[in-house]
Design a protein with these regions (language model features):
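Surface-exposed loop/turn motifs in large extracellular/passenger domains
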Residues: 1-215
Length: 215
């Protein structure tokens, strides 16, 4: 599923929104994302509606087959007063790399408004390539937020064989996690179980990488 452009929106007047996508691709193709939101597209239930997004990256052997991928200024999954739940599983095969479960970058954001909680769950791709992150937030003040509710982030690094650098949760340069009301932040990460180096549970690093609770 691809949503692109400022006028591209999935909205409701108060009901829940459920979006499920599975990436395709074959051979050495890459960038086969399950749910792909870019160029200021939005998923936005109104009222007390909840947003439930699930994505599975495609299984081709090219790079970057994310389960759920948001990128670009104004690209959002948000709510008015409901919960936002995003679950992604990275794809890829063979030596494919950078198959994140959930990837938020380049000023995109995921976050519940009002009293809603934000829950992100990601599983990195099971390949022999590197950098299969469970949850990856990076670049241009990309954000995971909650206005008054809690933020829950759970990531499992992927990889197999000699694969490495498979972080469970990677909050990198200008990646921000911000509970800006009364909510709490819970982050749980497990590094990949492959035999390569640097399979870290939770990584926070790079200029501007931030985890902030105003409570």
């Amino acid at each position: 599923i691809v949503l692109t452009g400022n006028n591209t929106r999935i909205t409701s007047s108060g009901g829940d929104i459920n979006v499920t996508g599975t990436g395709g691709g074959s051979g050495t193709s890459g960038s086969n994302h399950g749910v792909y939101v870019l160029n200021a597209a939005k998923i936005f239930p109104g009222g007390n509606g909840h947003a439930v997004i699930e994505g599975q990256g495609g299984t081709a052997s090219g790079a970057s087959n994310s389960g759920v991928y948001l990128t670009g200024t104004g690209s959002q999954i948000t709510s008015t007063n409901g919960h936002v739940t995003v679950t992604g599983t990275g794809g890829g095969s063979m030596g494919s790399s950078m198959n994140a479960g959930v990837l938020v970058d380049a000023s995109a954001s995921i976050g519940a408004s009002g009293i809603g909680n934000t829950t992100i769950t990601g599983q990195g791709g099971n390949t022999t390539g590197n950098s299969n992150y469970g949850v990856f937030v990076s670049n241009g003040n990309a954000m995971i937020t909650a206005s008054q509710g809690d933020i829950n982030i759970m990531g499992q690094g992927g990889g197999n064989g000699t694969s490495g650098i498979n972080f469970g949760v990677n909050i990198s340069t200008q990646g921000i996690v911000d509970a800006n009301g009364s909510g709490n932040i819970f982050i749980s990460g497990s590094g990949g179980i492959s035999s390569g180096a640097s399979n870290v549970g939770i990584a926070l690093g790079g200029p501007g990488a931030t985890v902030l609770s105003d409570t």
